[in-house]
Structure formats: C-alpha cells, structure tokens
C-alpha cells in the first residue's frame, strides 16, 4: 500500500516538476555499462550480456527526473566516438571493472585522454568501480589512487564502488545523477 502511495505521489510530482538530464556512459569493454543501465531502469541483473556494438540510447525515469543515457561501446574501435557523445551532457559516467586490475592502467589512460578534450571541459564526472562483489576488487580509495583522479582539477569528480549484481551503492549513484539534473548545461 505504501509503495502504491509513493508511486502515486511521484506521478503527481512529475506532472508539475519534470526535469531531464542527459548523460554518457563510457568505459572499457566488459566493465558493466549496459548492465548498469538495465539495473537502474528495471532492477534486473543478467549475467548474459552481449557487448554493445556502437551505442545504445535509453530513457529512464526516476521520480520526476528523466535520464537520457547514451551507453557507448567500450571496445577499442568505438572509443573514438566517446568524445562526440560526451559533448553537452549533464554528466559523464565512467565505468571500471574494479576486479580486473590488469585493465586499470588502460582504463586510467582512456579516462584522462577523454577528459583532456577541450569540448568536455567542466562536465562533471562520476567514476564507478563496478563488480565490488568480486574478490580483489579495488575499493573507492584504491580507485581514486590508481585512476589518478586527484589530478583532475577542471571539473567536479566523484567516485563510488558499486556492484550491479548485488545492487550495492546503486541508490547513492542515482542520487548523484538526479542532483546533477539540476545543473543542466547549455
């Protein structure tokens, strides 16, 4: 009954206070980008994901905020597209497989190369270390250090350790995203 009332209130609020945001989700292949989109959209986790070829776009509504998500493929042949899809968005979400330590250096280099693009200056970045449920996954402090996030000074940057499978920290991730819908870029 309480859930029904909550949904009814969310619907009523959405009639008067709609907000939209656009974000781009990037990161190396197999980091969990499409899984993340599925989890925030439907709460469903699936082990059987097919790698994204090119990009997917999906709209997700949470409360009175509609989030347009560009999920860009992480294979090397698609990384040149990242910048184009990151221009003018409210936020860039950079996904890392926190348990695949051998790929951290490549992931760090791709993130810093992307953020060096002048057209992306000032766009907030949310770094998500996914797969925290796996053994040897890096925690937030380790991710900040290994990804050299303290060197990024020209924008807001935030880092969370999440698990799409266990739905760990998905709620605070959504809170961060919704907060950034209020700072729409022109």
Curated annotation (Swiss-Prot):
It is found in: Late endosome membrane; Lysosome membrane; Cytoplasm, Cytoskeleton, Spindle; Cell projection, Axon. One of its GO terms (cellular component) is lysosome. Its EC number is 3.6.5.2. One of its GO terms (molecular function) is GTP binding. InterPro entries: Arl8a/8b, P-loop_NTPase, Small_GTP-bd, Small_GTPase_ARF/SAR. GO terms for biological process: anterograde axonal transport; antigen processing and presentation following phagocytosis; antigen processing and presentation of polysaccharide antigen via MHC class II; autophagosome-lysosome fusion; calcium ion regulated lysosome exocytosis; cell division; chromosome segregation; endosome to lysosome transport of low-density lipoprotein particle. There is a cross-link at residue 141 (Glycyl lysine isopeptide (Lys-Gly) (interchain with G-Cter in ubiquitin)). It catalyses: GTP + H2O = GDP + phosphate + H(+). GTP binds at residues 29-35, 71-75, 130-133. Residues 1-19 dip into the membrane without crossing it. SUPFAM superfamilies: P-loop containing nucleoside triphosphate hydrolases. Keywords: Cell cycle, Cell division, Cell projection, Chromosome partition, Cytoplasm, Cytoskeleton, Endosome, GTP-binding, Hydrolase, Isopeptide bond, Lysosome, Membrane, Mitosis, Nucleotide-binding, Protein transport, Synapse, Transport, Ubl conjugation. Ubiquitinated at Lys-141 by RNF167, leading to its degradation. The keyword Transport applies. Belongs to the small GTPase superfamily. Arf family. Interacts with tubulin. Interacts with BORCS5; recruits ARL8B to lysosomes. Interacts with VPS41; the interaction mediates the recruitment of the HOPS complex to lysosomes. Interacts (GTP-bound form) with PLEKHM2 (via RUN domain); the interaction is required to recruit the motor protein kinesin-1 on lysosomes. Interacts (GTP-bound form) with PLEKHM1 (via RUN domain); the interaction is required for PLEKHM1 localization to lysosomes and for ARL8B function in delivery and degradation of endocytic and autophagic cargo in lysosomes. PLEKHM1 and PLEKHM2 compete for interaction with ARL8B. PANTHER family: ADP-RIBOSYLATION FACTOR-LIKE PROTEIN 8, ADP-RIBOSYLATION FACTOR-LIKE PROTEIN 8B. Small GTPase which cycles between active GTP-bound and inactive GDP-bound states. In its active state, binds to a variety of effector proteins playing a key role in the regulation of lysosomal positioning which is important for nutrient sensing, natural killer cell-mediated cytotoxicity and antigen presentation. Along with its effectors, orchestrates lysosomal transport and fusion. Localizes specifically to lysosomal membranes and mediates anterograde lysosomal motility by recruiting PLEKHM2, which in turn recruits the motor protein kinesin-1 on lysosomes. This is ADP-ribosylation factor-like protein 8B. The gene is ARL8B.
């Amino acid at each position: 009954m309480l859930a029904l009332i909550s949904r009814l209130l969310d619907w009523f609020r959405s009639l008067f206070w709609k907000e939209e945001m656009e974000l781009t989700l990037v990161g190396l292949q197999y980091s969990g980008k499409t899984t993340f989109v599925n989890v925030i959209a439907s709460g469903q986790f699936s082990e059987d994901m097919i790698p994204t070829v090119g990009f997917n776009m999906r709209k997700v509504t949470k409360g009175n905020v509609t989030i347009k998500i560009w999920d860009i493929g992480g294979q090397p042949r698609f990384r040149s597209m990242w910048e184009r899809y990151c221009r003018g968005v409210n936020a860039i979400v950079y996904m890392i497989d926190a348990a695949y330590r051998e790929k951290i250096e490549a992931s760090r280099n791709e993130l810093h190369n992307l953020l060096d693009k002048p057209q992306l200056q000032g766009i907030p970045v949310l770094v998500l270390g996914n797969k925290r449920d796996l053994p040897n996954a890096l925690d937030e402090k380790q991710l900040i250090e290994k990804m050299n996030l303290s060197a990024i000074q020209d924008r807001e940057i935030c880092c969370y350790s999440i698990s799409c499978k266990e739905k760990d920290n998905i709620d605070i991730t959504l809170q961060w995203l919704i907060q950034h819908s209020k700072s729409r870029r022109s």
